[in-house]
Amino acid sequence: MNTKARALGMNDTRFLDPAGLNDNGQSTVQDLVKLVVYATRYKNIWQLLQEKEFTITSEDGAITHNIENTNQLLGVIPNISGGKTGYTDLALGTMILIVDIPGHRDTIISIILGSKDRFGDTRKLVDWITDAYHWE
């Protein structure tokens, strides 16, 4: 993961486990934006991040997992194209949210770190951006 991060230009990120739960791992907002831009290339995965619930089935059909998305903003903020939530006791709440701008090829990438109210803070930030800026 760290090799891939460097290849993406994520020079201030250090992964210590795939889940990101090790408190000694670190990243920056700038590096997370690079990761989000890269991840959006994988539409089949990104599409799942828009769903409140979905089922994943093994290739042989023997195992299924029902997944509930923890993103409480799905269906609340319009035009969400994906997002990722996170929480650890040390990092507190984290949230990455990608919102498409209707009629334009632009997107808002909102990243909240160290929050006690990641969903509320994300909503405030996205609302402020959509109120403060106008796309032509």
Stretches found by the model and what they are:
Residues M1-E136:
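Penicillin-recognizing serine hydrolase domain
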